[in-house]
From Swiss-Prot:
Its main location: cytoplasm. SMART domains: PCRF (SM00937). Keywords: Cytoplasm, Methylation, Protein biosynthesis. GO terms for molecular function: translation release factor activity, codon specific. The modification N5-methylglutamine is found at Q235. InterPro entries: PCRF, Pep_chain_release_fac_I, Pep_chain_release_fac_I_sf, Prokaryotic/Mito_RF, RF-1. It is found in: Cytoplasm. This is Peptide chain release factor 1. PANTHER family: LD18447P. The gene is prfA. Peptide chain release factor 1 directs the termination of translation in response to the peptide chain termination codons UAG and UAA.
């Protein structure tokens, strides 16, 4: 193991002791938000320290096997133990290197998911509905909670635009690479000649800020409009001006919410979406600056990039960023998104490891 890696691991051992002490402090326990953040960090640090301790034990086992090898009667046993210890040491070193890669602090957060129909008219709107269903089914598999915040329905079904909140552990870490252009190739239900049409949707995944990260909004920079909600929402949906639209005048960013009968709650949710969009705008600008010096295959986050094609006649999904092709489109559209998510995460980790090797 490299000396620099050992120094990093020593810092994690010390940090684990600090976290144990902090989490036992009554003052920390009274701060629910701070306690949750420290608890999440404790889980992460504990996993690293556990592997570090196992690595140290296997190093001792390897040294003991080397001593045993000098005894002819124990040489065969020593060789077997040395091979076992070395194999586990190699595996643990790889795991530790991966765990010590730079972490996106937003990975643990819940998200706002935005899907917008693009080229393709009604077929694009129908595909937006299919994408929402795919992400909803995936969230159900993960035990996450999905809350529809606003939707603009199309005439034939689907959505011109839909915004949902997905709440749970590490939602952003799983879904952040979904941002970008999604292209679909299939025969629309309205097509009488059996011709394959191509249409597209844009997906944006925004990390939900916590209270400590909340963007400060100047009331003078906001225009708040109320209107009657439309679309699916129950029998009371059109009776009051409960829907809220908030415009951030300096940037032109807009957020709206119409899912609740309470105007007050809709306003609070719309403000949360607006804060996430402003924070995401800063993130994208920062990534654009970084991209000027380092081209990242996976993490560019450019919403104009076509990242994926869904070819229904062939049952094929292709992610163009990592040249991934899977012939299991039906299962993926039904929420089995892990094969795609894990491949993207692995590709990004490989990029980071390569950067560390170069550095």
């Amino acid at each position: 193991m490299k000396p620099a890696l050992r120094l990093q691991l020593d810092r994690y051992v010390r940090r684990l002791a600090e976290l144990d002490s902090l989490l036992a402090d009554p003052a920390v326990m009274r701060d629910a938000g701070g306690f949750r953040a420290l608890s999440r960090e404790h889980v992460e640090v504990s996993g690293i320290v556990e592997r570090q301790r196992r690595h140290a034990q296997r190093e001792r086992d390897l040294a003991a096997a080397a001593e045993m090898a000098s005894d002819p009667e124990l040489a065969a046993m020593a060789a077997e133990e040395a091979a076992s210890a070395q194999a586990e040491l190699d595996r643990l070193a790889t795991e530790l290197q991966r765990l010590l890669l730079p972490r996106d602090p937003d990975d643990a957060r819940s998200v706002f998911l935005e899907i917008r129909a693009g080229t393709g008219g009604d077929e694009s709107a129908l595909f937006a509905g299919d994408l929402l269903r795919m992400y909803t089914r995936y969230a159900e598999r993960k035990g996450w909670r999905v809350e529809l915040l606003s939707a603009s329905d199309s005439e034939l079904g689907g959505y011109k635009e839909v915004v949902a909140r997905i709440e749970g552990d590490a939602v952003f870490g799983h879904l952040k690479y979904e941002s970008g252009g999604h292209r679909v190739q299939r025969v629309p239900a309205t097509e009488t000649q059996g011709r394959i049409h191509t249409s597209a949707c844009t997906v944006a995944v925004l990390a939900e800020p916590d209270e400590a990260q909340e963007v400060t909004l100047n009331p003078a920079d906001l225009r708040i409009d109320t209107y009657r909600a439309s679309g699916a929402g129950g029998q009371h949906v059109n009776k009051t001006d409960s829907a809220v639209r908030i415009t951030h005048l300096p940037t032109g960013l807009v957020a709206e919410c119409q899912d609740d009968r309470s105007q007050h709650r809709n306003k609070a949710k719309a403000m949360a979406v607006l804060a996430a969009r402003l924070r995401d705008k800063d993130r994208l600008e920062r990534q654009a600056r970084e991209a000027a010096t380092r081209k990242s295959l996976i993490g560019s986050g450019d919403r104009s990039d076509r990242i994926r094609t869904y070819n229904f006649p062939q049952g094929r999904l292709t992610d163009h960023r990592i040249n991934l092709t899977l012939y299991q489109l039906g299962a993926i559209m039904d929420g089995d998104l892990d094969p795609v998510v894990k491949a993207l995460v692995a590709a990004r980790e490989a990029e980071l490891l390569a950067e560390l090797e170069i550095g």
